[in-house]
Amino acid sequence: MATRRLQTPIGLRFAAPLRRVLNRIEARLDSERERTGLWLPVALGTGIAAWFALPAAAHWIGLLFLLASGGLAGLLIGWSSRIGRMVVAGCGMTAIGVLLIWARATWVGAPVLAQPATTAFSAEVEAVEPLPAKGETRLILRPRGRDDLPPRVRVTLRDQAGSTIVPGERVGLRARLMPPPAASLPGSYDFAQRAWFDRIGAVGTVLGDISRAPDAGQGGQPLRARLSEHIHRQIEGSPGGIAAALVTGDRGAISAEDEEAMRRSGLAHLLSISGLHVTAVIGFAMLFARRLLALSPRLALGGYVLPLAAAAGALAGAGYTWLAGAEVPTLRSLIAALLVLVALLMGREALTLRLVAAGALLVLVWRPESLVGPSFQLSFAAVTAIVVLHESPVMQRFMARRDEGLVRRWGRGIAGLLVTGLVVEVALAPIALFHFHKAGLYGALANVVAIPLTTFVVMPFEALALLFDSAGLGAPFWWIAEQALRLLIALAHHVADAPGAVATLPRFPPWAFALAVAGGLWILVWQRSWRWWGLAPLLAGMAVLAQQPRPDLLVTADGRNIAAAVPGGGYALLRDRAGDFVRDTMNEAGGSDAPLGALAALDHVECNVDFCRWIQGGRIILASRGRDRIEGSVMAPACAAADVVISDRWLPRECVGRWLTIDRDSLAESGGLAIYLGEKPKAVAALTAGDGHPWRNAPQVSGNDEAVPKAALAR
């Protein structure tokens, strides 16, 4: 039998098209060679994010092998090609990100309390955070002589007396302690993760009074605390709380209502010391220093004015950061500001994406865990969006200086500020929706007034008031600052109360958020036409966000709090006496902004002392709410007639729902649940089975050693 010879080998048949594709990509990368380095922090962050997303060490090691294979593939492509170098560098930086966060999580490891415990102990006070708006004081303590307690404990003292406690003081107390709580619902805040990196092994509440040494507190409060107290004496209430927050970072005196209004109006960023505040301080310090130094002909003619003014600005920024407590967001802003000053001194453009990328690299190497927090994501997303917008030819032409009247120039400036605000709000919306399940829609308009008001009125007059207080002449400046702050709060409430001011969404999959972020980065980093390829993943991710259904049932990790979706939007609680924290958590997880009602008050719900029964999504729900013991034989018929059975207690074997049975044992493994009832019902758990992250498998201490007397003080 004759055979026909294969004319073209299969490998060669695909080689030519592949080569053409690679050549086109190579040409595009070469045309954007100045932007390729911007992907280094993205690759580093991808490795860090992958470590958080993957559950166990086997997956992390597998990812490292996969990245090593990718690096080898890049070498095979060729180091001389830009594609090969980018593949090698990208895989290498991603692997470094995995190893960096893995090492950091291991290095900060400390024992965690195994179970709730009530115990007396003595401790050294490490930090004091007054919360006058709540009538509380928060303390970070280092227990002494108690190996059965974690090395750092955070407790809350429910009175104002704790505000006189100073760091370094030794105290004796009795407290109800518990392990740092994990996320109570899918997508909600995971304090256990945050506490692990802060080395906090237990949280709790002080019971009774704190015992202090007779001479305790005579050394005086730290400068930061004294300054906050002085500001609160000059301006009372929430305006004083915001004034203190702008100087020392102390937000404890801001009422919950005003803080929520700031958040809903898109002005919450003004309450945390960040790039805006640090930049304002450095800018005013440089302006003052330049005007003063320019009076010296020798310095002016010698070209020393700008370097000395930059040094003065750097010192002012560093001092401000130290005064504000040197928190991670403030330090991050200081690093970025110092990079801008270095660029100015080198004669380079002040703010570019390269500087933003360098700042991101420094922060991720220093604190890799900050990547998954909203603060890092919001700040770098905002700065990146602003830089990209003002690099665009259209914006540069619009903002270019020209001969025109004062009104037109001011109008153009306001329009530029409004456009910038809109772009920033669009960039921040997916992040806010992912972390907080809500986003203010009118933030751009509110910030047009709020940012200049804060930067050019509140902060300068507050600084002048503090300066003139040394001579007893600060009262007029305090009055002006207070009126501006009251105007700011009124603006926040007006915007927050406007119809449609807040968009809410329920929890959505992390992969959809990652898809939207990847698309946004592709658009922001590149400059050529292929940047718009990023619209595909961006719109796909946003489509998932917009179409995400709200859960029919929400069950917290302890099983005590259950929220059921009600017709027309909103949720109703099984136990309607739940506190504000539980209510806020339920509303956020369900993507609702409506007040929570009482489940027992609904017409379609049948309740007795022990149980409530209702139909949800075509399925029968049975939830326990009593504390009395019920025999399994008595419960069995009711459980068998229900599709879903929920209890915060251990259920007997006889109690089994037709589809899902939830009790204390199952919740210990799954954590809180979001339940979707429909044709294909599903339950999404807050905890991942087999999660190997260190805060899920931490070394534990009992906290049960009562050898220390109740009021003992370590000597």
Q: What kind of feature is each model-predicted range?
A:
Residues 47, 123, 175, 246, ...:
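Divalent metal-coordination and catalytic microenvironments
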Residues 65, 69-70, 78-91, 204, ...:
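Hydrophobic alpha-helical transmembrane segments in multi-pass membrane proteins
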Residues 132, 211-218, 260, 264, ...:
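Membrane-interface amphipathic/re-entrant loop segments adjacent to transmembrane helices
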Residues 2-34, 95-269, 641-644, 650-654, ...:
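Membrane-interface helix/helix-cap signal primarily in integral membrane proteins
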Residues 102-162, 172-174, 545-616:
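Membrane-interface segments at or immediately adjacent to transmembrane helices
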Residues 32-77, 373-376, 380, 473-524:
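Membrane-embedded alpha-helical segments of integral membrane proteins
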Residues 2-116, 335, 409:
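Helix-loop-helix transmembrane hairpins and adjacent membrane-interface loops
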Residues 571-649, 683-715:
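Pre-active-site segment of Zn-dependent metallo-hydrolases
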